[in-house]
């Protein structure tokens, strides 16, 4: 830790305090995440350290780079590249009645998908995507933070500050207690974030697991075995759930054109086996008029 100086506390993440810091030798500004683990006494589990070490290899222009993993007094510090703004703060800063330019919405979504395809192709899930862990710079680049941390540390029910971890972006199969979930959980989260980037409002903002499910059901219809084989056998599925018909997404989601709504509906398909993959989503006609050559992952690297 002697290599870094803490400059200031910049926030509280899912796992602990985040500081802005500086690498003493190079002057590089970094984000330092102090990981606070459930059972402090036992120190950092070796499995977590193994998982985290693998994440240093996830190098992509749309993934926040993990630069270093340090231990100090049985505390784990993760050193990441520094970006000053997250998507949530950015959306909150847009004046009432104004929205993100439609081309930037498209560009952000495409870049998010590029980062996700990269991680999914390396069998790394995120599991906890939300606007707070999408970081942006002032050049139109968006990067995904905290990839792979859920597997290393689990997702706590409450942040260490006792704030409840948000359910708004959580896939229907996770909310219904499925234990065999995979890459489609991230695609669902991206769908909900897509709607929020366009409208500045969370698509499904429940304040408990059941409220979250019912908000989804009211919008998309209550799922059954017909639309999603096996849903009725998931551990948190109840036959007593009200049977909503579901309306159309377009009534909830303004500012997204027809192609965008088509893509959104494919990302929010209940059955994970039928939900569009991140790779397929990138090929959707919604992105036909996006200039992809200028995106960071498409720059020809020397």
UniProtKB/Swiss-Prot annotation:
Which EC numbers characterise this protein's activity in its record? 2.7.11.22, 2.7.11.23
Q: Which GO terms describe its biological process?
A: cell division; G2/M transition of mitotic cell cycle; mitotic G2 DNA damage checkpoint signaling; regulation of circadian rhythm
Q: PTM Phosphoserine: list the residues.
A: 277
Phosphotyrosine is carried by which residues?
Answer: 15
**UniProt keyword terms in alphabetical order:** ATP-binding, Cell cycle, Cell division, Kinase, Mitosis, Nucleotide-binding, Nucleus, Phosphoprotein, Serine/threonine-protein kinase, Transferase
The molecular function GO annotations come to: ATP binding; cyclin-dependent protein serine/threonine kinase activity; protein serine kinase activity; protein serine/threonine kinase activity; RNA polymerase II CTD heptapeptide repeat kinase activity
Substrates-to-products reaction catalysed: L-seryl-[protein] + ATP = O-phospho-L-seryl-[protein] + ADP + H(+); L-threonyl-[protein] + ATP = O-phospho-L-threonyl-[protein] + ADP + H(+); [DNA-directed RNA polymerase] + ATP = phospho-[DNA-directed RNA polymerase] + ADP + H(+)
Q: What family does the entry list?
A: Belongs to the protein kinase superfamily. CMGC Ser/Thr protein kinase family. CDC2/CDKX subfamily.
- Record's protein name: Cyclin-dependent kinase 1-B
Which gene does this sequence derive from?
cdk1-b
